[in-house]
């Protein structure tokens, strides 16, 4: 049963908010203290809301999103509501993962060393390289002919 964000009473006492980014994907993540095991992803593009497993479809991406909970031992203690836009499904999953890690840090700042050691607080800054003029792409060149 999928619930809408408006169905949750979002107050500073029962939610933790953070933003995660990866490539072109941006995820706004709310951790819901009162609703454990509720995982909803809302796509800004389609204005639909999905169950997390239904949205990411691949088990590896689902495990990647849940990794911050596993590392800190907070499995089953929070629900996730996230809205994502931009990028592909893999980048969106990593953006949600990064947002979850930052939101857990808001919940308990003592988790910082654990999350840092797992590499969850370092944003992956790799972006697509821009196309250069006079070339086919970022690195690919047009075929050169001497005559």
UniProtKB/Swiss-Prot annotation:
Disordered as annotated region, ranges: 128-147
GO molecular function, one term: RNA binding
GO annotations of cellular component type: cytosolic small ribosomal subunit
Keywords annotated in UniProt: Ribonucleoprotein, Ribosomal protein
Keyword Hydrolase: no
Record's keyword annotation contains Metal-binding: no
InterPro entries referenced in this protein's UniProt entry, alphabetically: Ribosomal_Su5_D2-typ_SF, Ribosomal_uS9, Ribosomal_uS9_bac/plastid, Ribosomal_uS9_CS, Ribsml_uS5_D2-typ_fold_subgr
Gene3D superfamilies (UniProt xref): 3.30.230.10
GO biological process, one term: translation
Family membership noted in the UniProt record: Belongs to the universal ribosomal protein uS9 family.
NCBIfam families: PRK00132.1
Name of this chain's protein: Small ribosomal subunit protein uS9
Organism placement in taxonomy: Bacteria, Pseudomonadati, Aquificota, Aquificia, Aquificales
């Amino acid at each position: 049963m999928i619930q809408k964000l408006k169905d949750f009473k979002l107050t500073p006492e029962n939610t933790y908010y953070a933003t995660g980014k990866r490539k072109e994907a941006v995820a706004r993540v709310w951790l819901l203290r009162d609703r454990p095991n509720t995982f909803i992803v809302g796509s800004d593009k389609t204005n639909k809301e999905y169950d997390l497993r239904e949205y990411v479809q691949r088990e590896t991406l689902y495990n990647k999103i849940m990794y911050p909970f596993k590392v800190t031992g907070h499995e089953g203690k929070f629900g996730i509501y996230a809205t994502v836009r931009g990028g592909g499904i893999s980048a969106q999953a990593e953006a949600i993962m990064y947002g979850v890690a930052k939101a857990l840090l808001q919940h308990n700042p003592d988790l910082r060393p654990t999350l840092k050691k797992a590499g969850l607080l370092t944003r992956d800054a790799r972006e697509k390289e821009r196309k250069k003029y006079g070339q086919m792409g970022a690195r690919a060149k047009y075929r050169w002919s001497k005559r």
